[in-house]
Amino acid sequence: MSIITDVYAREVLDSRGNPTLEVEVYTESGAFGRGMVPSGASTGEHEAVELRDGDKSRYLGLGTQKAVDNVNNIIAEAIIGYDVRDQQAIDRAMIALDGTPNKGKLGANAILGVSIAVARAAADYLEVPLYTYLGGFNTKVLPTPMMNIINGGSHSDAPIAFQEFMIMPVGAPTFKEGLRWGAEVFHALKKILKARGLVTAVGDEGGFAPKFEGTEDGVETILKAIEAAGYEAGENGIMIGFDCASSEFYDKERKVYDYTKFEGEGAAVRTSAEQIDYLEELVNKYPIITIEDGMDENDWEGWKALTERLGKRVQLVGDDFFVTNTEYLARGIKEGAANSILIKVNQIGTLTETFEAIEMAKEAGYTAVVSHRSGETEDSTIADIAVATNAGQIKTGSLSRTDRIAKYNQLLRIEDQLGEVAQYKGIKSFYNLKK
């Protein structure tokens, strides 16, 4: 009854109006699962391959018909007949079928769509929520959200190099309250921006993209919004985080962090050592709890030096640096680079490998932050993954745009369903920092 009888993929659109995949898996019993695949704007060079058609006459070359065909004609044939509950065997079969180290033959987008749909079909077959199926009876921790309320870098036209300015309601008693705090700060920020005559249009991830005078202007404005909403900045209230996305403005030839790429003439050009000094300056000045991709993805010496300098005080998250890959994470753990990993399911391509990366991080005392991509869909699987793994943190955008809110609303449902068992750890989510 739990045997897979059909697998079907179609091309749909993501939140940026670009094509992506939706995959459906059916079983003998009638149980059904559907998975949709996200897509990134700033991508790590070591990420698994997102297969695009390259036909410029269709969707500007971004079509996904090849990946759709790979699901319908190759993957389907290979996994029909499997028990839908055998997630690892199915994921491993797809990895073997692809046969490349970066899923470049079938496409990580094709493989991931199937992987998610299989898990959802299994949960449907067993008549349990997805987070329960994935995590078992010990599932209980609601993640502390990183809310990206200001977008810069590659996610907007704002003249700021850092890609994301985030708030984290670390002092909230529950996820529901934390979400409310974030929404109220978001609206307070909008009022402040309007009063300054700044644009309140939102970027890819639902955050504002105003023409600030620089990084510190952005942080100061967020602090004013926190105060205006009636909250305090700090461990008992709301803390701040950055995604620097440094690889986006790192000049490989000159080996410098060239802020002029986004901030224009007269902006800073920093060496690796100066970049670390600058980040430390910001940490000393503001209530910052997390910094993602503070150094370029290939600047291993810089990462180690940054971790040595700030690793006990601030969460240092590797995104482009680790690309949700256990091979890179293992090296980071061994060399003392970063203290946290960003988990993006489409960077690696299967749920099995995603869970392995989270497990490896936790065993090494690293935190794991489950994350969306800038090109998202209404699929809320990452909310279930965050709870299933008790990851403790989620990064899924701002407090606007349905593609972001879908994940927050799913977490509200899960918190309700868990009832008294639910835990929201807030500041305790940063278990590897010395407070």
Curated annotation (Swiss-Prot):
Binding annotation for Mg(2+): 243, 292, 319
Family annotation (InterPro entries): Enolase, Enolase-like_C_sf, Enolase-like_N, Enolase_C, Enolase_CS, Enolase_N
Catalytic activity field: (2R)-2-phosphoglycerate = phosphoenolpyruvate + H2O
The record's free-text note on cofactor binding: Binds a second Mg(2+) ion via substrate during catalysis.
A GO BP entry: glycolytic process
SUPFAM superfamilies: Enolase C-terminal domain-like (SSF51604), Enolase N-terminal domain-like (SSF54826)
Essential cofactor(s): Mg(2+)
Family: Belongs to the enolase family.
NCBIfam families assigned: eno
Role: Catalyzes the reversible conversion of 2-phosphoglycerate (2-PG) into phosphoenolpyruvate (PEP). It is essential for the degradation of carbohydrates via glycolysis.
Name of this chain's protein: Enolase
Organism: Streptococcus equi subsp. zooepidemicus (strain MGCS10565)
